[in-house]
């Protein structure tokens, strides 16, 4: 694939951060002729050995970023964990150095490829993009959209924040390891969107907004502005009627489709009518048919319908895709039934909004909820109402246990402390009654106690399995 129009050959590019995304950037840029080096503020970046093995020509610099080093580059490529406000980055940008991220490089490459396809003697259709962001539900909606597009007969690549970095996905296609997709379905974080300006998605959504990453953003307005960058193109805007902050992102003159847990205001919007998913006034499918429970998943399904329908795909195929969607790991995932109590892993619930949705999604069932970890500067106040309405008890772990305890103190629900997650499982087992749920939905990041949210889930599931074995022996 020819990217001469991007003028990468010989360009001095410095990649900042050597996680999965940084490594993918270094690899893709090197293949396409850039003079690549990598800098990471950590003394021992996670992929240092892999970089040396697979890209020995790429120099690695470790330790604090130096302004002069960054300013000497033609282009900075920022990993999601490196903010534009990083002083050395800000100084380089002020001196005229371009700063982009992997999604921006992908968007530019895709524009070149689509232009080349259109210029062929027998023009080929452009590859389309569905782009998804939001505080909660991103991965679920992304996976739903991928399944629904496949059910409609399209070749699909799902990538981005959901797992496979976009440039790794593009590299696999360039190497012939995967087919060229008809549609890209991308999950994008606010961190990625900060450095993205050229993405022109066929349909894009900001699913919802609640406090998250307040250790990175000065306020909710800055966080929302980063999310809104997903609408930089000309495609359909998909917005949540139940979230005023996302509705405010509607751009005059753009095609807007909304979704919400109410009746549809117009014929092209999606909503709920008498416990059925509906498009305008047309009933589409009973909510009970969805394999993923809870009203938050009803909202996810409606968003996915709005996004995929924007590609003019047949509604029957999209509904079949929804019916077959079984959910994702660590998103209110059932782990076990023990003595009449159902245990759920929602380790991916890393902010207050996600935990609120998980608790309300329990319906009439009371839950013993395990909360705590690294709160990322969030306001835990909104948890109080959800705890009061749905929790039998709260078990607290991690760095911000004290802050959460203070926020829910007046909820009328007792809270308990645990030193470890296995201890929390034991306490929850004693507190839960038959017919209850035990829900790990921490409302926090995991890095104070675990490698990541997956590691936290593994520890939880292991503890639940041990509990099940012990109860079976009694």
UniProtKB/Swiss-Prot annotation:
InterPro entries: Mur-like_cat_sf, Mur_ligase_C, Mur_ligase_C_dom_sf, Mur_ligase_cen, MurD. It comes from the Bacteria. It catalyses: UDP-N-acetyl-alpha-D-muramoyl-L-alanine + D-glutamate + ATP = UDP-N-acetyl-alpha-D-muramoyl-L-alanyl-D-glutamate + ADP + phosphate + H(+). Pfam families: Mur_ligase_C (PF02875), Mur_ligase_M (PF08245), MurD-like_N (PF21799). Pathway: Cell wall biogenesis; peptidoglycan biosynthesis. The keyword Cell division applies. ATP binds at residues 134-140. GO terms for biological process: cell division; cell wall organization; peptidoglycan biosynthetic process; regulation of cell shape. Keywords: ATP-binding, Cell cycle, Cell division, Cell shape, Cell wall biogenesis/degradation, Cytoplasm, Ligase, Nucleotide-binding, Peptidoglycan synthesis. GO terms for cellular component: cytoplasm. Its main location: cytoplasm. One of its GO terms (molecular function) is UDP-N-acetylmuramoylalanine-D-glutamate ligase activity. Its EC number is 6.3.2.9. It is found in: Cytoplasm. SUPFAM superfamilies: MurCD N-terminal domain, MurD-like peptide ligases, catalytic domain, MurD-like peptide ligases, peptide-binding domain. PANTHER family: UDP-N-ACETYLMURAMOYLALANINE--D-GLUTAMATE LIGASE (PTHR43692:SF1). Belongs to the MurCDEF family. Cell wall formation. Catalyzes the addition of glutamate to the nucleotide precursor UDP-N-acetylmuramoyl-L-alanine (UMA). This is UDP-N-acetylmuramoylalanine--D-glutamate ligase.
